[in-house]
Amino acid sequence: MILPSFRDTADEALAVAAAAEEAGVDGVFCYDHLWPMGQPERPALAPFPLLAMVARRTERVHVGTLVARIGLVPDQVLLAEFGALSVLAPGRVIAGLGTGDRKSAAENEAYGVPPAPADERRAALGRCAVELRDRGVEVWVGGGSRGTRLVAEDAGVVVNLWDVPPAAVAEQASRSEVTWAGPVPGAGPGAIADLVAGLASAGATWAVFAWPVPLATMVACARATAPGR
């Protein structure tokens, strides 16, 4: 699940992470935004300090970014942040990476970090993905465009698709491992169960829901679609 990080304090996110581990959730993730999309007046917690706190307070759950944006900090700084997180949570880190897009460009501009051209960002994405992969870190690439999906496929890492239907997952699953992330369906437990089952049938290896999440329902749906069930 994606933690509630658009807050003034980390209290809620830490409580949610603890509840997630207790409930049997496989992983918790954090956005890498300087503010919620289109809402610059609202706060946003930085992902790596928050995930570091989660790592130290948990024993089993994976911790990851969804997604850390290439170019927001120098590549070597980004790699070092994942390295430090891996020390705190060995074997539990998922490095979600992305290039950003027009929707997030305003954040870069506001903080004096104008985004590089798309081809340069994709090249840097490929280098970072390969470096982290070679270190033994699981890497997911946000596949919002065909260009970034090709980078992930070339690097042999996972493609993460945001809020797409199972048919799009199935199409990508023919080319690479694929995970899904998005909001919880608003039509109740039955809709969640149908979505999770559809994603599993399509080949998604993870389904990551954005907070707020009905934990018990989500875990029950995941267990019902697990291999051998």
Residue ranges of model-derived segments:
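Active-site-adjacent structural elements that line small-molecule/cofactor binding pockets in enzymes
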Residues: 1-229
